Amino acid sequence: MPVNEYGQMIGEPVDDTPGVLPSLVRIEGQYTIIEALSVEKHAEDLLAVYGPDTPREMWTYLFQPPVENLEELIVALKQMLERKDRFYYAIIDKATGKALGTFSLMRIDQANRTIEVGA
């Protein structure tokens, strides 16, 4: 491992070619599936997660309140998917086949090969 002028071990140099954008490829794990968010496929399941019966403390650090009904959720999901600077995914429980939540890959900086996982 390389050592700097202070005698500290440092990592190997990283290739400086720009990173590539993520793809919305489906990823299957032991307990969950990650797939591209779809209004048609996931909205009804997500109402249980983001709807009016959701515990209020779940929303402490989020920028929006829970939705009141399915129609409001559909509008919100469509607005999310219109964004071209984020990649939205649904998290699916393999045992039930139901969507348990969502996340996005955002603040993508290809030049510095960084990405943030968020809401």
Predicted feature locations:
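GNAT-family acyltransferases
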Residues: M1-A119
